[in-house]
Amino acid sequence: MTDPHLNTPQVSTSPTFERSQDFLNIDEPPCAQETPSVSTFNLPGPSAPAQSVDKPVPMIRRRSTNYMDALNSREQARERESSIGEHAPGAERRSSGPMDFQNTIHNMQYRTTNDSDLSHAGVDMGDSISHTPICSRAGNRPIFKNSYLDNNSNGNSARVPHGSPPQLGTRRKSSFKYEDFKKDIYNQLHMFGEK
């Protein structure tokens, strides 16, 4: 009794088996296919074959991003601005160039701004937030605790009492808290103590 699932296909009935025999017959190998030449492969010109009607689209040269080109175009933009400024001194004109974005960033970083430029005190939209000043403008002296002031001087100098470390702030970074916690655990477990 033979199982029909275990039988191999007959040579005469399987077309894929017949095609695979082409590569197994070493006495008569198949012919090599011709490799297309690079000089005649879809290139426009006199040596290209006229087989296809559609010519490939030539590569479009993008705007140069070389440093010298950018500097030259920046100088040309400055010259245009100066000539425009001479003809119309009251009007503020702006020309865009290849380095317009970089110039904008540079101007934002290095331009000095006044508080009056940024304040909106004259505009009342009903949704403004009034900011209270942190320190009074009446006195420029820093405010110290009375225990730190020197009673012998006129109040311009301050001294720190000996024996107590100065408090820099009440809030410590979480990394310091973690380091203190580790130190306490190591001390309790005597991990790094001498044996």
Curated annotation (Swiss-Prot):
Upregulating conditions: Expression increases during wine fermentation.
One annotated GO biological process: glycogen biosynthetic process
Bias class Polar residues marks the residues at 1-18, 148-157
On whether Nucleus is a keyword of this UniProt record, the answer is no
Source domain of life: Eukaryota
**Cellular component per GO, a single term:** cytoplasm
GO molecular function terms attached to this record? enzyme inhibitor activity
Region Disordered: what ranges? 1-101, 146-175
What subunit structure does UniProt give? Interacts with GDB1.
| Descriptive protein name | Inhibitor of glycogen debranching 1
Organism field:
Saccharomyces cerevisiae (strain ATCC 204508 / S288c)
